[in-house]
Design a protein with these regions (language model features):
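N-terminal alpha/beta PP-like core and its mobile active-site loop of ThDP/TPP-dependent enzymes
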Residues: 1-331, 367, 371-374, 454-457, ...
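Hydrophobic, well-ordered secondary-structure elements that form the walls
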Residues: 296, 368, 380, 419, ...
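Thiamine diphosphate
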Residues: 114, 450-543
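Phosphate/pyrophosphate-binding active-site segments
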Residues: 136, 174, 197, 293-384, ...
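Active-site diphosphate/adenylate-binding microenvironment
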Residues: 6-10, 14-19, 32-37, 344-420
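Active-site nucleophile and cofactor-binding loops and adjacent substrate-binding regions
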Residues: 24-26, 45-56, 71-78, 133-134, ...
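Catalytic phosphate/nucleotide-handling subdomain of diverse soluble enzymes
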Residues: 412, 416-454, 460
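Generic hydrophobic/aromatic pocket-lining and core-packing "Φ" positions
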Residues: 10, 86, 142, 416-417, ...
């Protein structure tokens, strides 16, 4: 049948199983919005307060489900407002489709109103992007974009469609979405055999898990693998939940704000098995001294990650779920009780601790964990609160923690929470923010109230830019340049002005009551939780130092002379 391009686009979204789109209309994309209006029973459109919020919401939807998230915006500033969200998704390998509409073909290259080369702008931050100037190519382009976004290492894809394409007609025939194939052709039998021999020879193995294990859906295979080789487990920020955080073999996050146990264990192990982790500089500290006693065995779907930052001794390239399945078939049951006892003894001697009896970041996270029975979806912004959320909430399953790990995007979390809640209405969704981050995109509270999306925003409010100030305190002679927020914005009143319920709390009891009420209300809520400006995130590794030199608050006086 013959349809307009805008109708073809919407039909292709339906083909791919898209049920929710986040966006903001404008001149060049009007035809698409007209088509969406006609199909509002099949595809829900969430009008965000800003296009950046739409891109983060699509990201949160994707991370919470493993499906492709979709956002859209008009040409010019609408398109450029998506850029930060696209870059966030790119750095964390999140499958989103960003749909933009540009000026008509006849107006391209003429500095037309709201014309921008958004494909050129986003080329370095997309897995692929397309410019569609022919309506006859639109349907296949959309189908290909979804396949690219999902296949192999996931990532964002941009489709820029000229306005005349959305108005022109072409033949459309519905097609079933192409099944995404797991990348297995690079998994070599000899590489599997090498991995088996290295694991069997190890006396002190350590498993290090990243976001690739979640993207692959490898949590069950990972659990079997870990217990079969009887190894302690550390993870990255992006790998939280791939391995159950309540399992006795789990020792916590690795790296700059990782646990002392994980940083110690990886520094002492003789084999580091890396499952879908990309070796961010925040993980390894001093590259020359990282896991100095160990051979490194890396599993990853992307060959570009092998030897990129840390030299490996052996690797297996391919889908990590399939790799682990093959290894589980070949490996015997192993016993490393003596090694595990050593690591656990160190963990018991260096536990995660914080000041009790006063409202602090760690207390806030532990209370949310308790109130949600460890079953909520937690999104975060970026900073101290992000690290506390990683350290003190025990993630039992994949896709529970949504956070900007690679780009470190302040303003990410609220949009992501909205996207996650739209995707997982059965889950409680909390966004953990700092007061600096909340200012970035707090207008999205209006989105939550417009659609009654019951996300709970917890602002860990220390009236400073906490993480930057922590560095200034420890490494910049306590010169607090532009990190003190003296304006004292009343976030509870801001919330109420945007239609949400607002709380201001400063004690543990007040916070406990606010969280309990927020869960019971089942409406958008903002809790302004006021803590001391000098609270810091520990443990910590100084910039450029090896992770074995991880220090806690108890070490500050000796290390810094105060």
């Amino acid at each position: 049948m013959e349809l307009k391009g805008s109708e073809i686009l919407v039909q292709c979204l339906r083909e791919q199983g898209v049920d929710t789109v986040f966006g903001y209309p404008g001149g060049c994309i009007l035809n698409v919005y007209d088509a969406l209006y006609k199909h509002s029973d099949e595809i829900t459109h969430i009008l965000t307060s800003h296009e950046q919020g739409a891109s983060h919401a699509a990201d949160g939807y994707a991370r919470a489900t493993g499906k492709v998230g979709v956002c859209m915006a008009t040409s010019g500033p609408g398109a450029t407002n998506l850029v930060t969200g696209i870059a966030t998704a790119y750095m964390d390998s999140v499958p989103i489709i960003a749909i933009t509409c540009n000026v008509a073909v006849s107006l391209l290259g003429r500095d037309s109103f709201q014309e921008i080369d958004i494909a050129g702008v986003t080329m370095p931050i997309t897995k692929h992007n397309f410019i569609v100037k022919d309506v006859n190519k639109l349907a296949d382009t959309v189908r290909r974009a979804f396949k690219i976004a999902k296949e192999g290492r996931p990532g964002p894809v941009l489709i820029d469609i000229t306005k005349d394409v959305t108005a022109n007609k072409a033949e459309y025939e519905r097609k079933e979405p192409e099944q995404v194939k797991r990348i297995t052709d690079r998994i070599k039998a000899e590489d599997i055999e090498t991995a088996v021999k290295m694991i069997e020879a190890s006396k002190k193995p350590y498993v290090f898990v990243g976001g690739g294990a979640i993207a692959s859906g490898a949590d069950a295979q990972l659990n079997e693998f870990v217990h079969k080789i009887d190894s302690p487990v550390a993870d990255t920020l992006m790998g939280k939940g791939a391995f159950n955080g309540t399992d006795p073999l789990y020792t916590g996050m690795l790296g700059m704000h990782g646990t002392k146990a994980s940083n110690y264990g990886v520094s002492q192990c003789d084999l580091l098995v890396v499952v879908g982790a990309r070796f961010s500089d925040r993980v390894y500290g001093n590259a020359k001294k990282f896991a100095a006693n160990a051979k490194i065995l890396q599993f990853d779907v992307d060959p570009a990650e092998i030897n990129k930052n840390i030299k490996t001794d052996a690797s297996v390239i391919g889908d990590v779920k399939v790799i682990l399945e093959k290894l589980n078939e070949k490996l015997p049951q192993m016993n490393h009780n003596e090694w595990i006892t050593e690591v656990k003894s160190y963990e018991e001697a260096h536990p995660m601790t914080y000041h009790k009896g006063v409202l602090t970041g760690p207390y806030i996270i532990e209370k949310i964990y308790e109130a949600t029975h460890g079953d909520a979806i937690i999104s975060t912004e970026v900073g101290q609160h992000q690290m506390w959320a990683a350290q003190y909430y025990k993630y039992k399953a994949p896709r529970q923690l949504l956070t900007s790990g690679g780009l470190g995007t302040m303003g990410y979390g609220l949009g992501a929470a909205i996207g996650a809640k739209m995707a997982r209405k059965d889950k409680l969704v909390f966004n953990i923010a700092g007061d600096g981050c909340f200012r970035m995109n707090m207008n999205e509270i209006a989105t939550a109230t417009r659609y009654n999306i019951p996300v709970i925003e917890v602002v860990v409010n220390n009236h400073v830019l906490g993480m930057v100030r922590q560095w200034q305190d420890l490494f910049y002679g306590q010169r607090y340049s532009q990190t003190v927020l003296n304006d004292r914005v009343d976030f509870a009143k801001v919330a109420e002005g945007l239609g949400a319920k607002g709380y201001t709390v400063s004690t543990c009891e007040e916070f406990d009551n606010a969280v309990k009420e927020a869960i019971e209300l089942n409406i958008p809520v903002v809790i302004d939780a006021q803590i001391d400006k000098d609270d810091k995130v520990f443990p910590m590794v100084a910039p450029g130092a090896p992770i074995s030199e991880c220090f806690g608050e108890e070490d500050v006086a000796e290390k810094f002379g105060r």
